[in-house]
Amino acid sequence: IDPLTILKILKGGLKSICKHRKYLDKACASIGQ
């Protein structure tokens, strides 16, 4: 497998994780209360 392809996939994964971070933070906050 091409290392560049792996990097692209990792970057894409990080972007989607960051996108979901907002929702995760809200969920964690509501659970913590």
Swiss-Prot record:
Its main location: secreted. GO terms for biological process: cytolysis in another organism; defense response to insect; venom-mediated perturbation of biological process. The keyword Transcription regulation does not apply. One of its GO terms (molecular function) is toxin activity. Expressed by the venom gland. The keyword Secreted applies. GO terms for cellular component: extracellular region. It is found in: Secreted. Keywords: Disulfide bond, Secreted, Toxin. It comes from the Eukaryota. Electrospray ionization experiments give a mass of 6598.6 Da for DELTA-pseudomyrmecitoxin-Pp1a heterodimer (subunits A+B). Heterodimer composed of subunit A and subunit B (DELTA-PSDTX-Pp1a); disulfide-linked. This heterodimer has insecticidal and cytotoxic properties. Induces immediate paralysis when injected into blowflies (Lucilia cuprina), and then death within 24 hours. Also inhibits the growth of Aedes albopictus mosquito C6/36 cells. This is DELTA-pseudomyrmecitoxin-Pp1a subunit B. It comes from Pseudomyrmex penetrator.
